[in-house]
UniProtKB/Swiss-Prot annotation:
Transmembrane segments: none annotated. This is Probable outer membrane protein pmp16. SMART domains: Autotransporter. It comes from Chlamydia pneumoniae (Chlamydophila pneumoniae). Residues 646-952 form the Autotransporter domain.
Length: 952
């Protein structure tokens, strides 16, 4: 149980401190589940606003102004454009506008900086006051409004607005490339940093913007306006440590729109305080407005650690829409009603996770002596709709309250596109907590599930007056509960209460891991003993029963079901003697009706019924009829999901093989040019290798694209005995056909080549020894569930080739050479584990072996016209004498399911061809171009080499 001490006096005592720009400590319950995200935001804050800690010294301690002449004339416009820098520091004015007062104000195209710091107005606008509009745009240097202040004028009376800037027209901050600072500004009444009676627009800025530690005791700790739009900004915007009455950061009388921002928008540690909790003030810890929309933001929106003395720890509003945005998080916020959100009377709230997740965690209300977790509080006639697109979640780790009367049903996933998850979970509430309101959400009105999944997990529960499942899936997990309750208009009776469930799923992994089945409960109405059965409500459970995991997928690939399981408790029913839970059309035997991948087997469900007498001392024992659904599991094998099969894991061996084979074949230049035979030559070669492997039943094909270079140093004796040392390096990408799976590789090959002529060059033999090392990065995509995983392995390849050719001269310019060559290659790769979604482990069980015997004829034609040139044509038949395909064992780590994959069944006969051109540009320099390829019914290869030879 959360034991938060009474806070009213504590925060009332801090109200005075807030007025002077100090921020009260905000109580935090437990470690934020979004800890990593919070750390990233801390780093983002530090890097985005590097000048924050040095603003006081940076702006100086002596009065400075860039301008001479009349700076205070409410009928004239002031335009400050194309200045290198602007300074207005420590200026005092006895009425509006400590530094400047005018009709319309424009600040644009400042190159270096603009400082408005430590200015004081005895009236509105501590730094700038405008009768008309104020625009700050297209500035390249930092813009700093620091420690400006607007004080009430005792002689004229009236309220003051805008600690830094106040205007009666519209206020615009747009297209700035310099970081914007509103820091430590304060005012006696409205808008701690800025206030406008018109529309405030913060739009299209390309630099961060900060509202920090601004205060306004009457409202709008950072800004106050009629309407505010924050849109199209690409860098972070922070509202941090601001303090006001209504709206710790922002207060508007009509709307706030946050839209199309690719940079994050953060509301952190803002506070709404009031001198009295009963005054109706002190609401909206971050935002207080009539209409708030958060739409189409790719960037993250965060409300964290905001506090109010009354309504809505983060937001107090009548109309709220969140849709088509990236992640939106509400964490660690606190209020008296509505830990995160307060929905005022006749409200409409649409929370749709359509391009990112929406999450509520660790939000709290402290209405009673002991604080409790709460996300949303709905007042009378609220219209609340919660939705999520497929692949996204609207998650509540804190309960919601939907208890005041309304004619609008609470709707889960209202639209056809809402096929995602609405999650209620108490996973982050301490195990020791036993305060029911920390776990249970309540609707004393009508509720409907229309699409997608409503998931209740980890001790969370719902109390419904009326719940109807019109579509979608209701999923229950560990210790979850659904109970009946009274009507909001007649809280003393539950007449008419009914829960209708027609498509129930159980989160099997959570049941097996934590051991407590979910419950459907006809709940007694009494709040204290003695408790009695409630004979008014009914629960109707019908349709199939399915098993799912946390991702709303079947669980057979996410847990180990390789062994038999007995007496798995799937569901509990707590009923009354009159049997008001109807299961006549409920079919748990449907567990065996669906086909699936993963572990195969048979479920044997059965009911156990227990009848007792009422024990009225406890609400859990008041009912008399208990039924429990159990099931036994008999495993029958394992069926691999094709998306997890992992054929991609064999491609590093094939890629290593094709690289090595092509290099060994390129050495087959027996009887090279008679143009010149140097003692020493060095070759530099650019390589391109392309391979297409056709798909076969059960295994997809692949394409290899490889580029690299090779270096060779050769020495030849007068007897034409030749030895070469070679080094090659390749950068390769292999893509699986029919998917986005791919392998990126870096291969190196070292080789030794020896060529020996025999019997006065009647024939010649050649030998090649080579070793290759490969570094392979595998990237797998599983499109059905938008998953991806990656891993790295290493390959070792050994190769040897022996060749023999029989050169003979047909004519003086034409040479023909029949040849035969034996190429043996062995390749092996290391074991590895993936990281990412549903990772797998791969273990090499059999290496790759290949023995190929190319044989054919090579013809050379030489010409010395203009420059010595040689053409070589070659045709060969390439039978595979022996091959052992690689075999790799695969284990899906989540379930322990395992299987083997084999490499492609390479066709054993191929036709090879080669074209080679060599031109002697100079006595010591040759250029050559070499193309060789092969084709078979399964595979085609293309190897292109271009290089030069230096002769010594």
């Amino acid at each position: 149980m959360s034991k938060t001490p009474p806070k009213f006096l504590f925060y009332l005592g801090n109200f005075t401190a807030c007025m002077f720009g100090m921020t009260p400590a905000v109580y935090s319950l437990q470690t934020d589940s979004l800890e990593k995200f919070a750390l990233e935001r801390d780093e983002e804050f530090r890097t985005s606003f590097p000048l924050l800690d040095s603003l006081s010294t940076l702006t100086g301690f002596s009065p400075i102004t860039t301008f001479v002449g009349n700076r205070h004339n409410s009928s004239q416009d002031i335009v400050l454009s194309n200045y290198k820098s602007i300074d207005n520091i420590l200026l005092l004015w006895t009425s509006a506008g400590g530094a400047v007062s005018c009709n319309n104000f424009l600040l644009s195209n400042v190159e270096d900086h603009a400082f408005f710091s430590k200015n004081l107005a005895i009236g509105t606008g501590g730094a700038i006051a405008c009768q008309g509009a104020c625009t700050i745009t297209k500035n390249r240097g930092p813009l700093i409004f620091f420690s400006n202040r607007g004080l009430n004028n005792a002689s004229t009376g009236g309220e003051t607005r805008g600690g830094a800037i106040a205007c009666n027209g519209d206020f615009t901050i747009s297209q700035n490339q310099g970081t914007f600072y509103f820091v430590n500004n304060s005012v006696n009444n409205w808008g701690g940093a800025l206030s406008t009676n018109g529309h405030c627009r913060i739009q299209s800025n390309r630099a961060p913007l900060l509202f920090f530690n601004n205060t306004a005791p009457s409202g709008g700790g950072a800004l106050r306006s009629e309407n505010t739009t924050i849109s199209d900004n690409t860098r972070p915007i922070y509202f941090k440590n601001n303090c006001g009455n209504n709206g710790g950061a922002i207060q508007t009388s009509v709307t706030v729109a946050i839209k199309n921002n690719s940079g994050s928008v953060i509301f952190n540690n803002n506070t709404a305080l009031s001198g009295s909790i009963n005054s109706g003030n002190g609401s909206g810890g971050a935002i207080y407005t009539t209409n708030l929309s958060i739409d189409d933001n790719p960037g993250t929106i965060l409300f964290n650690n905001n506090y109010c003395i009354r309504d809505g720890g983060a937001i107090c509003t009548q109309f709220l829409t969140i849709k088509n945005s990236g992640h939106v998080y509400f964490t660690n916020n606190q209020g008296n009603w509505g830990g995160a959100l307060m929905l005022l009377q006749d409200s409409t709230c649409l929370l749709f996770a359509e391009q990112g997740n929406i999450a509520f965690q660790n939000n709290e209300v402290f209405l009673t002596t002991f604080g409790r977790y709460n996300a949303i509080h709905c007042t009378p006639n609220s219209n609340l709709q919660l939705g999520a697109n497929k692949g996204y979640t609207t998650a509540f780790f804190d309960p919601i309250e939907h208890q005041h009367p309304t004619t609008n049903p609470l709707i889960f996933n209202p639209n056809a596109n809402h096929q995602g998850t609405i999650l209620f979970s108490s996973a982050y509430i301490p195990e020791a907590s036993d305060y029911e309101n920390n776990f249970i959400s309540s609707s004393k009105n009508t509720s409907e599930l229309r699409n997608g999944v409503l998931s209740i997990e980890d001790r969370a529960g719902w109390q419904f007056y009326k719940f109807t499942q019109k579509g979608g899936i209701l999923k229950l997990g560990h210790a979850a509960s659904i109970a009946t309750t009274a009507n909001s208009e007649t809280p003393s009776t539950s007449v008419g209460s009914q829960v209708i469930i027609n498509n129930l799923a159980i989160n099997l992994p959570s049941i097996l891991a934590k051991g407590k089945a979910p419950t459907l409960w006809i709940r007694p109405l009494q709040s204290s003993a003695p408790f009695t059965e409630d004979n008014n409500p009914t629960i109707t459970l019908s349709g199939p029963l399915t098993l799912l995991n946390e991702e709303n997928r079947d669980p057979y690939d996410s847990i180990d079901l390789s062994e038999p399981l007995q007496n798995i408790h799937l569901l509990s029913l707590s009923d009354v003697t009159a049997r008001h839970i109807n299961t006549d059309n409920f079919h748990p035997e449907s567990l065996n009706a669906t086909e699936h991948y993963g572990y195969q087997g048979i479920w044997s469900p059965y009911w156990v019924e227990t009848i007792t007498t009422t024990n009225n001392a406890s609400i859990e024992t008041a009912n008399t009829l208990y039924r429990a659904l159990y099931a036994n599991w008999t495993p029958l094998g394992y069926k691999v999901n094709p998306e997890y099969q992992g054929d991609l894991a064999t491609t590093p061996l094939w890629q290593s093989f094709h690289t090595m084979f092509s290099l060994l074949r390129s050495y087959n230049r027996t009887g090279d040019s008679d143009i010149e035979r140097p003692f020493l030559e060095i070759q530099g070669i650019a390589d391109g290798l392309f391979v297409h492997q056709n798909s076969i039943p059960g295994a997809p094909g692949f394409r290899i694209q490889s580029t690299g270079y090779s270096l060779q140093a050769s020495s030849e004796t007068s007897l034409h005995q030749k030895i070469s040392l070679g080094f090659a390096q390749f950068f390769t990408r292999t893509k699986e056909i029919g998917s986005s799976n791919n392998v990126s590789a870096h291969n190196t090959v070292s080789s030794l080549y020896v060529e020996l002529p025999w019997f006065q060059e009647a024939f010649a033999t050649s030998t090649v020894l080579a070793y290759g090392y490969g570094d392979h990065h595998l990237h797998s995509l599983h499109p059905s569930h938008q998953e991806q995983a990656e891993g790295t392995c290493y390959s070792h390849t050994l190769a040897a080739a022996i060749g023999c050719s029989f050169p003979w001269q047909q004519k003086s310019y034409l040479h023909l050479s029949p040849f035969v060559q034996a190429i043996a290659i062995r390749s092996h790769q290391t074991a590895f584990e993936e990281i990412g979604d549903n990772p797998r482990k791969f273990v090499s069980q059999k290496p790759f072996y290949n023995l190929t015997l190319p044989l054919g004829i090579q013809g050379k034609w030489q010409s010395k016209f203009h420059v010595p040139t040689e053409w070589t044509l070659e045709l060969s038949y390439q039978p595979v004498l022996y091959q052992q395909n690689p075999q790799i064992g695969v284990t899906l780590l989540a379930s322990g399911g395992s299987w083997d994959i084999l490499g492609h069944n390479y066709v054993r006969n191929a036709l090879g061809y080669k074209v080679h051109n060599q031109t002697a540009l100079f006595r010591s320099l040759d250029l050559f171009l070499d193309y060789q390829g092969s084709v078979s019914s399964s595979t085609s290869t293309h190897h292109l080499q271009a290089g030069s030879t230096l002769k010594f």
